[in-house]
Amino acid sequence: MGLRGLFAQGLLGKEGVPSQGLAKSLSARPGTTLIPSEAHSYRADTERTEGGHKVVRLAVVQELHNHGKTPWTPAGAVLVGPQGEEWKALGVWPLKPIAPGKFRQVVVEVETMEEEARGTFILKLWSQEGGGQAELFEGVTFP
């Protein structure tokens, strides 16, 4: 079970997994359809190492408002690091549409080396509806 599973079961919180509020640092790029109203980031250690480096799981949980005119359904995401490196999301949850004018919580989870989980990131989300334009959220940091 990853962080998404913990979140879905209500087990992801400050007691066991370090978390951090992103409300003051997170911003959507101009021209986006989705506006975050609340956001938190999480970090969880795994028992794994790769090449002698500790592997961690990171999650971003956002309450997103669709201020567009059509539904927006998450399809995938990447986390873009400070040097432009990208980590494909292990998953985006839930894969349900956000109706125009409505809010929905969206969770994105990635896995990376502990050393790479430092700095300020951009979260890039794209929709099932296509259109080619990704939703970009700047100022993502992790505890």
Named regions from a protein language model:
Residues M1-G31:
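A eukaryote-biased signal for short, well-structured alpha-helical docking elements
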Residues G31, R57-A59:
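Extracytoplasmic
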Residues A59, T70-A77, R118-I122, E135-L136:
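Short, hydrophobic/aromatic beta-strand segments
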Residues E63-G68:
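Asparagine-centered strand-capping/turn motif at beta-strand->loop junctions
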Residues E86-L136, P143:
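Short, solvent-exposed, Trp/other aromatic-anchored flexible loops in extracytoplasmic proteins
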Residues A75-E85:
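Extended low-complexity, serine/threonine- and proline-enriched intrinsically disordered segments
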Residues E38-V55, P97:
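Short, solvent-exposed beta-strand/turn "edge" segments of beta-rich domains on protein surfaces
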Residues A8-G10, E38-R43, L58, T70-T73:
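Activation corresponds to long, low-complexity, non-globular regions
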